Amino acid sequence: MGFQILTINPGSTSTKVAWFDDDKLVWKDSVEHDAVTLSQFPSIAAQFELRASEVEKAVEKHGSDLNTLDAVVGRGGLLRPISSGVYSVNETMLKELIDARYGEHASNLGAPIAHAIASKVGCPAFIVDPVVVDEMDDISRLSGWPELPRKSIFHALNQKAVARRVARDFFSVPYEQLNLIVAHLGGGISIGAHKKGRVVDVNNALGGEGPMSPERAGTLPIMKLADYLYEHKPDRKEFSKKLVGKGGWVAHLGTNSGKDLEERVKNGDEHAILILKATGYQISKWIAQMAVALAGEVDGIIITGGLAYIPELVDFIQERVLWIAPVFVVPGEDEMLALAEGALRVLRGQEEAKTY
């Protein structure tokens, strides 16, 4: 029997739980939380006991024994900017997450729940590559306004995980020896330049930068945006929603569904075809930008995330970027496996857990 690892990923209305034997999935579950029940809590942090209890019930339901665990891993929440890696859960981290010092999000409960369970059974608790991973070069942080530096917020967990797998399975070398461009294509789209294990440049997928995506507007013409603000004077919440949530495909087509778009394209919907091509075009341009960040020394380009299941989109992108480097398509995202793989590297002595 290998190392026994429990992974926990809290979302807005559910908590995903999975049990691994080394990197082999034993079982997984998604505990749904009633929206009305959750709305009665004054904060996300106040949901801790409810969600922790539900995680333990899921373990019991699947017949696993918490006392056999070698590690518990929670999804990393909103912390200060940190370098990539596996972090031991400590009191400083717990306090900042519970207090929502850097923002409130359901993922803030990942580390506290992992720590609570790990403390009961005497094993370590970790987080792996949270969205706040920041390894950008200083030169890539600058914008044309000193008051508005660029920030690193991206799909770090999935980008790092698929980059490691491609390095292992196709190059037979450690991830830290390669220069890769990883394009995570989901509800949000982030494209990162991975230079010998560090993401030295990446678009801020949550901050209005990059290609348009199913739900996000991406980079916009700035003077036109200023005109819109002066003319319409939207409130902050409404405006933020137009950028993240109701932008991109939602604004153009009224849908955020890749399957819906794919169906409309197959049925010959010319506007849907145009939006798919425009999305692919913008993604391709950002991939090319990241080749510049790597000075043209690119070993491979990885296309991952849920939209990588759309062949028309992937083919469009490949036609435009194959001149840069070979393209590897790794559809979907497996955050639970990525969490387990991080813990496994520490348990096997391949990596040392960092202190927050």
Curated annotation (Swiss-Prot):
Its EC number is 2.7.2.7. It is found in: Cytoplasm. The keyword Kinase applies. Pfam families: Acetate_kinase (PF00871). GO terms for cellular component: cytoplasm. SUPFAM superfamilies: Actin-like ATPase domain. It comes from the Bacteria. The keyword Kinase applies. InterPro entries: Aliphatic_acid_kin_short-chain, Aliphatic_acid_kinase_CS, ATPase_NBD, Butyrate_kin. Keywords: ATP-binding, Cytoplasm, Kinase, Nucleotide-binding, Transferase. One of its GO terms (molecular function) is butyrate kinase activity. It catalyses: butanoate + ATP = butanoyl phosphate + ADP. GO terms for biological process: acetate metabolic process. Its main location: cytoplasm. Belongs to the acetokinase family. This is Probable butyrate kinase. It comes from Coprothermobacter proteolyticus (strain ATCC 35245 / DSM 5265 / OCM 4 / BT).
